């Protein structure tokens, strides 16, 4: 299976942005802007916007994701949301292990693994984020680190479950900084992700895996990044908050 036969996915990660009122306005602009997309379009929104997003996107080509999920099904975990709660709302995707969760909320490779398995068990499609800091890149350990992150995240995930997994390479030094990995840097790490998945699950499984790039992808650099053979889509932060910018990236994925 080559790139043309893999599912390209452009996912917007709204982070802690947009009230329910603001979400309605943005989604109203997004629906016509991406209606002719040749790739899968996902918006991952704050918990408070999920109901609005699911209701407004019914009958459209936009899929809805959450930005976090807890690893337990239920119980005394004040403030947490389970996979069953999300799927019951009509949510399809969930972001797991974003660098901001790792940096500010003590997310670890082990909790990423627990959340991934809980998401899959609950019927969600996890978008697992992996990536290195600037120090780690300068030390030359990027591939070693990313391989470890992928292996731990997928520990206990079956080959059948892997079909519902997306992995996003997001270099931490490029998140919200305006800095972007070059297309060649992105390709190198995305190819390494596919390689380690091939070692774990076989070449066919690796060829079928959607690997995204996340890290200041924008309308100006999207086409070059998405033209690379192992970059199948993007996890988009700031540019996902503006319908016109997001639509340009979606169009680039359609061409890519």
List each model region and its residues.
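Active-site loop-to-helix "anion-binding N-cap" substructures in soluble metabolic enzymes
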Residues: 1-256
């Amino acid at each position: 299976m080559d790139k043309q036969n893999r599912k390209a996915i452009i996912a917007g990660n709204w982070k802690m942005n947009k009230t329910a009122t603001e979400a309605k306005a943005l989604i109203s602009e997004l629906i016509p802007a991406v209606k002719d997309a040749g790739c899968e379009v996902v918006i991952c929104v704050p918990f408070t916007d999920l109901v609005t997003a699911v209701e407004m996107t019914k009958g459209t080509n936009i899929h809805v994701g959450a930005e976090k999920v807890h690893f337990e099904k239920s119980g005394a975990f004040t403030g947490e949301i389970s996979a069953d709660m999300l799927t019951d709302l009509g949510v399809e995707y969930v972001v797991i292990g974003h660098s901001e969760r790792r940096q500010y909320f003590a997310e670890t490779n082990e909790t990423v693994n627990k959340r991934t398995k809980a998401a899959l068990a609950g019927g969600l499609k996890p978008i697992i984020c992996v990536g290195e800091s600037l120090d780690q890149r300068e030390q030359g350990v990027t591939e070693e680190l990313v391989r470890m992150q992928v292996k731990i995240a997928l520990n206990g995930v079956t080959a059948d479950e892997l079909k519902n997994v997306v992995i996003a390479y997001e270099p931490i030094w490029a998140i919200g900084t305006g800095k972007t990995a070059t297309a060649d840097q992105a390709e190198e790490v995305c190819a390494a992700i596919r390689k380690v998945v091939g070692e774990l699950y076989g070449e066919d499984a690796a060829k079928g895996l959607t690997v995204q790039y996340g890290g200041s992808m924008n309308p100006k650099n999207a086409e070059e990044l998405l033209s690379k053979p192992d970059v199948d889509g993007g996890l988009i932060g700031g540019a996902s908050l503006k319908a016109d910018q997001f639509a340009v990236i979606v169009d680039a994925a359609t061409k890519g």
